[in-house]
Amino acid sequence: MPIWVDADACPLPVKEILYRAAHRAQVVTTLVANQGLRVPPSPYIKTQQVEKGFDVADHVIAQQVIPGDLVITGDIPLASWVIDAGGEALNPRGEIYTRETIQARLGMRNFMEELRSAGVQTGGPAPFNAADKQRFANALDKWLLKGKLS
């Protein structure tokens, strides 16, 4: 039950939670990014640097994920691929993507993309805050506990 992290856009507080959790739960956690990353020394924390390019890290993660893996990503298409592969997806704000919710999220993402393409300014997500950090930590702990019980 390894953890994969779409690390290019992952907030630092989320990475720090993941580092502690990887060590505490002894779960291999691989951060995939198109740039070098500094991570604490640990046999459970790995990095994988990929070529620069649109969605390159997403494709690398999607090709390696297997059922039971957890992927940390805010990228809706990647989350959909992960779910289709039998993995689980959690965004950095603590929202767990499920087979039931991912289609609606994809539809909304595509709709917003169409608006932006038409020149409509849609704004962005709210700044990452302490409540997001806590929701993420709680969701990660729940996933780790579920893994230990199975």
Curated annotation (Swiss-Prot):
Transmembrane residue ranges: none
InterPro entries: UPF0178
Top-level taxon of origin: Bacteria
Pfam families found in the cross-reference section: DUF188 (PF02639)
Family: Belongs to the UPF0178 family.
Protein name as catalogued: UPF0178 protein ASA_3749
Native species: Aeromonas salmonicida (strain A449)
